[in-house]
From Swiss-Prot:
Substrate binds at T17, K49, L81, R95. Reversibly transfers an adenylyl group from ATP to 4'-phosphopantetheine, yielding dephospho-CoA (dPCoA) and pyrophosphate. The record marks H25 as: Transition state stabilizer. This is Phosphopantetheine adenylyltransferase. Signal peptide: none annotated. The lineage of its organism: Bacteria, Pseudomonadati, Pseudomonadota, Gammaproteobacteria, Legionellales. It comes from Legionella pneumophila subsp. pneumophila (strain Philadelphia 1 / ATCC 33152 / DSM 7513).
Length: 170
């Protein structure tokens, strides 16, 4: 039994909507890839929200952004996170914390996931200091007003958001 638990702890899931993926997300994924032999970046379909980018687009942009990292896989999911984690035989949920304001929600989420399965732990990483203020919401707002988002997101995301802005202005 102990060996199975240890194997599960070798695989982490980093879930999110990634709408769009930011340099803060990439920082956490890059650093986590050096900690865990296997990291699954799990892109939530999140039917309750109206995403700016399609699920397929978000998955594709992430694959392009982290494809060079060893042991990292990008997967979409549309079920309960804890069920997805167990289906993947993972033992760690990795979450990013930007500010104290994120902590309360993340703390509640971690507690709920712990109630749903004692086999899974939640770990938190903070992005690099210069990336802590970046959020997908702020990036979308800046992009919508034709602002320069190149310092906040990977180049492929800049291109995709510009393309979307051009399509909307037609």
């Amino acid at each position: 039994m102990q060996m199975v638990i240890n194997e599960m702890k070798q695989k982490a899931i980093y879930p999110g909507t990634f709408d769009p993926v930011t340099n803060g997300h990439i920082d956490i994924i890059t650093r986590a890839s050096t900690i865990f032999p296997e990291l699954i970046v799990a892109v939530a379909s999140n039917k309750n929200k109206r995403p700016y980018l399609s699920w397929e687009s978000r998955i594709s942009l992430l694959e392009e952004s982290v494809g060079h990292l060893t042991g990292v896989r990008v997967v979409g999911f549309d079920n309960l996170l804890i069920d997805f984690v167990l289906e993947q035989n993972a033992g760690i949920i990795l979450r990013g914390l930007r500010a104290v304001s994120d902590f309360e929600y993340e703390f509640q989420l971690a507690g709920m996931n712990r109630k749903l399965s004692k086999k899974v732990e939640t770990l938190f990483l903070t992005p690099a200091e210069h990336l802590m203020y970046i959020s997908s919401t702020l990036v979308r707002e800046i992009a919508a007003l034709n602002g320069d988002i190149s310092q906040f997101v990977p180049p492929n995301v800049v291109r995709e958001l510009k393309k979307r802005q051009n399509e909307r202005s037609l």
